[in-house]
């Protein structure tokens, strides 16, 4: 599905941003346009790629010209507005640019995951370290009651679904690319089976749709339980967690 012209127009402006004040305006407008796209049920993965590239272009633009190197979801092409923008390096003013429009942003903690997402060399023993990091992200088993997911179980889409899958994909295919692409490459490298990659891809897309919808509804930063989710979202979340 082709992106709406309004998204394409804004993405053309981002690399030519001439001031940090203009950057704030572009970031605010991006959220408004993104909300419209979500309302029209545009593809969540395509929207995250668009939003990620927009952030990268703004940070590199003449008006911002930040010395930092983006990492995390933005560098991978997985960024959503409910996720913190992360970078390697120091720029105290940059955090303010994002926070002024309601976005979380901060310098990333030093880790192999941050370095890999930023496109820095993996180094000796890097893949083993990524595997160990992925294992630490393994979420707890979803609590069941009478054969169904416990409706009082806490819902944390990023910690339970997105972060563990991103860590597996990072190990399967190190490099700054979207998680869905990493999973596909993991199959080509024979470190993931096609069945495993397909299951992870489906869970990732499900989690992304849920996370983006909660941001659209302005509840992504609120604690929630399965009981709080609409029935279809509750079913989708439970299936993805399995």
Regions picked out by a protein language model, each given a short descriptive name:
Residues 1-66:
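N-terminal regions immediately upstream of nucleotidyltransferase
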Residues 34, 38, 122-242:
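Conserved nucleotidyltransferase catalytic core and NTase-mimicking acidic/glycine-rich helix/loop elements
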Residues 42, 52-91:
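Active-site nucleotide-donor binding segment shared across nucleotidyl transfer reactions
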Residues 69, 88-141:
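Conserved catalytic core of two-metal-ion nucleotidyltransferases
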Residues 1, 15-23, 43, 111, ...:
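Intrinsic-disorder/low-complexity, polar/charged segments
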Residues 73-74, 105-118, 185-186, 224-228:
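A glycine-rich phosphate-binding loop feature that marks nucleotide/adenosyl-phosphate handling sites
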Residues 80-82, 103, 203:
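Short coil/turn motifs at beta-sheet boundaries
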Residues 53-60, 92, 96-99, 170, ...:
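A broad, structural surface signal
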